[in-house]
Regions:
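A conditional alpha-helix N-cap/helix-loop micro-motif detector
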Residues: 34, 88, 119, 163, ...
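Hydrophobic/aromatic beta-strand patches that form the interior of the parallel beta-sheet core
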Residues: 53-55, 85, 108, 138, ...
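Structural beta-alpha unit
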Residues: 2, 6, 11, 15-19, ...
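Gly/Ser-rich helix-loop-strand patches that form or flank binding pockets
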Residues: 8, 16, 96-146, 250-294
Length: 294
C-alpha cells in the first residue's frame, strides 16, 4: 500500500474540513478474504483518520482470536483506535444493532460478485444489512491485500429526493480517496411515453423533443454540481433512456468502473423483491464495488 499517498490524502481531507467518517466498521467472517478486507479497511481508516471497529458475529474461540490478532499485528492495527467486538445471534440483526449502538458512520462488507436465484429471494446477510442499516455501506466484491484504487467511479444521478446529497457526498469521497474520473449517470423518466407522444409530430419535432429531454437531465445534474468542490475531478454527465438498473450496470461494465455510488432506497417487502427495484436488481448482480450513501 502507498502509505505516503494515504497520509497525503488524510492531510488534504483535514485541511478541507472533510470528516466524512469518524468511525468505520468492518464485518468479518473467518474466510480466505478476511485479511484483504482488513487491508482495504485500513486504507480507509488512514485516509479518513477514523476509528476502526471490527465486528464478528459467531463463536469466539482462542484460536480465532489469535488468528485475528496476528493479522491485526501484521497490518499495524493493534492500537487505541482499533477495537474488536464479538457478537452472537443472527448476523444481519447483530451487525445493524452494533453499528447503531457504536455510532458507526461507514460499514464495510465483503460480497460475492454473483448470487444465486434462491439467495436473491430469501435475501443474503449483506443485502439485509444494506437495506436496513442507518449508516453508509461500502460493499467490496474483490478486496485486495494491495488495496483497491477507485479511479473510475459511477454515481447515480437519477432525479430522486436524495440525489443532491448523494452527489455531494460522492464528490467528497472521491476527492479524499484520489479518484480522478467521475461519471454521473442520469435517466430520462417516462422516456418511452414522452417519445411516443412526440412521435405524432414530424421527424424534426421528435429530434427536438429528444434533445430537450436530454438537456433537462443534464441541467438537473449541473444545477446540483454548482457550488460543490470539483477540484482535481473530471466529471462526465451521461444520460440514458433504457431500463435504468440495466443501463447502470451495463455502463459500469463498459467503462470497467471500480466503484458505483447510489443513494438509499428503503421499505422493501417480500413482494417488492419478487418485482425488483433498481437497488435490488443491482444487488443481485453487482457490476463493481458499491457504496450506498445514507
Amino acid at each position: 500500500m502507498n502509505w505516503p499517498f494515504a497520509k497525503k490524502c488524510s492531510i488534504l481531507a483535514k485541511l478541507a474540513g472533510i470528516f466524512m467518517y469518524r468511525k468505520i466498521a468492518l464485518a468479518i467472517a473467518f474466510s480466505p478474504r478476511m485479511e484483504a478486507l482488513i487491508a482495504e479497511t485500513k486504507r480507509l481508516v488512514g485516509v479518513f483518520d477514523a476509528e476502526l471497529l471490527l465486528i464478528h458475529v459467531g463463536e469466539k474461540t482462542d484460536e480465532l482470536e489469535e488468528k485475528l490478532d496476528l493479522i491485526l499485528e501484521a497490518h499495524a492495527l493493534k492500537g487505541p483506535k482499533t477495537s474488536v467486538l464479538w457478537k452472537e445471534g443472527k448476523p444481519a440483526k447483530r451487525i445493524i444493532q452494533t453499528c447503531e449502538e457504536e455510532q458507526v458512520d461507514l460499514l464495510v462488507l465483503g460480497a460475492l460478485k454473483k448470487e444465486g436465484l434462491l439467495t436473491y429471494y430469501i435475501g443474503s446477510v449483506a443485502r439485509k444489512v444494506i437495506r436496513k442499516i442507518k449508516c453508509s455501506v461500502l460493499t467490496l466484491i474483490e478486496p485486495q491485500l494491495s488495496t483497491t484504487q477507485f479511479c473510475q467511479v459511477v454515481i447515480n444521478g437519477t432525479q430522486l429526493d436524495e440525489t443532491p446529497h448523494v452527489i455531494a457526498e460522492s464528490l467528497k469521497f472521491c476527492r479524499t480517496l484520489g479518484a480522478t474520473q467521475l461519471h454521473i449517470l442520469n435517466d430520462i423518466p417516462l422516456y418511452g411515453l414522452q417519445m411516443a407522444t412526440a412521435g405524432e409530430g414530424s421527424g424534426d419535432e421528435i429530434a427536438l423533443t429528444r434533445r430537450k429531454l436530454v438537456q433537462e437531465e443534464i441541467n438537473y445534474v449541473q444545477g446540483i454540481l454548482e457550488g460543490l468542490d470539483q477540484s482535481e475531478l473530471k466529471v462526465n454527465i451521461k444520460v440514458t433512456a433504457g431500463k435504468w438498473a440495466v443501463e447502470l450496470v451495463r455502463y459500469c461494465e463498459t467503462i470497467q468502473a471500480d466503484l458505483l455510488i447510489m443513494g438509499d432506497q428503503r421499505g422493501y417487502t417480500f413482494i417488492d423483491r419478487l418485482f425488483p427495484h433498481d437497488l435490488e436488481e443491482i444487488l443481485a448482480e453487482l457490476p463493481c464495488n458499491l457504496l450506498i450513501v445514507k
